[in-house]
Amino acid sequence: MSIVRMTDLDLSGKRVLIRQDLNVPIENGRITSEQRITASLPTLKRALEQGAAVMVTSHLGRPKEGVWSEADSLAPVAQRLSELLGREVPLVRDWVDGVEVQPGQLVLLENCRMNVGEGKDDEALSKKYAALCDVFVMDAFGTAHRAQASTHGVIRFAPVAAGGPLLMAELDALAQALDAPAKPLLAIVAGSKVSTKLELLANLVGKVDQLIVGGGIANTFIAAAGYNVGKSLYEPDLLDTAKKIVADAKARGADIPLPVDVVTAKQFMPDAVAEVKAVDAVAEDDLILDIGPQTAAQYAQLIDKAGTVVWNGPVGVFEFEAFSKGTEALARAIASSRAFSIAGGGDTLAAVDKFDIAQQVSYISTGGGAFLEFLEGKTLPAVAALDARGA
């Protein structure tokens, strides 16, 4: 990729517009998780230290275009940024037609999704954004899969368009995991439905050495192998698809190891009685809610031998203590592995937090949908636009 990096630019005296992802959860005016705000600080500080006139914008929630609403205002974010940076961070409400900002100053521009034309990647709005700055910096990987005015259109028209440190760290980590991985490459893909991860599975099966499936996805593969899954969540209409994915893997020498034992219950309840069963001993009224200890040990061995691990999704109902052991075993294996590891997806990050392994994972992707689309082999609009500008 030939993307211009913000870290390679001299921003002194330049007007710099930075698109961040500051879409944080807010309840009753209070920010309940500020991870995205703290993640943005090094980018903002770097621009300020170089003497740039810094404008920052982000989306928050899903406001109606053309209508200001307090519930979707970035006001709490501006206040928290000012506390973290130790300087006043004014919030500018009407900013599309011009912004007053001096070198060494930082202003936060109100929720860009309130601007008419943002969602449709309107060209006129994109040009107005571009006219605000000398340099546009795209640093919001989490929205890189959306072709909108602040994530795509402005890149086409800004005098200079660059990738910010957060975005580039994400792209560098994903490239290391998928484009030139240390072998063997092992992926863990889990979730409730094969249908939501079909493209991901189809793309990864052409790259990986081992593909571990978990959750409802694993149940569909177990059923496709001819085993009874009882009352478990699975997709009977995708059994042939699962068989094809297994055949495609085998054809290129890759492996999709199936569970040899599972943890079952009679009801989907936190206090349900957990019972370990061989995969061929599942009863008609059983629910499969986790992988069994023997399977977890086998998978942990594969992780230990891997050169690269990509993790998307917990392998059991880890929110229920009795059905969290499989996910915990894999999390601990990843934490102690020498492999380059990348973890992403909301439930995966919750598992990383629950088992306190964040420091042992090489890279944690906060990209959500963008992370998934990249794993699916799709071109992200923001990345493609930055690449075109850097060529």
From Swiss-Prot:
Matching PANTHER family, A to Z? PHOSPHOGLYCERATE KINASE (PTHR11406), PHOSPHOGLYCERATE KINASE 1, CHLOROPLASTIC-RELATED (PTHR11406:SF23)
> Entry's InterPro entries?
Phosphoglycerate_kinase (IPR001576), Phosphoglycerate_kinase_CS (IPR015911), Phosphoglycerate_kinase_N (IPR015824), Phosphoglycerate_kinase_sf (IPR036043)
Its EC number(s): 2.7.2.3
Coarse class of the protein's main subcellular location: cytoplasm
Q: What is the lineage of its organism?
A: Bacteria, Pseudomonadati, Pseudomonadota, Gammaproteobacteria, Lysobacterales
The name this protein carries in UniProt is Phosphoglycerate kinase
**Organism per entry:** Stenotrophomonas maltophilia (strain K279a)
The reaction(s) annotated as catalysed by this protein in its Swiss-Prot or TrEMBL entry are: (2R)-3-phosphoglycerate + ATP = (2R)-3-phospho-glyceroyl phosphate + ADP
| Gene3D superfamilies registered for this protein in UniProt | Phosphoglycerate kinase, N-terminal domain (3.40.50.1260)
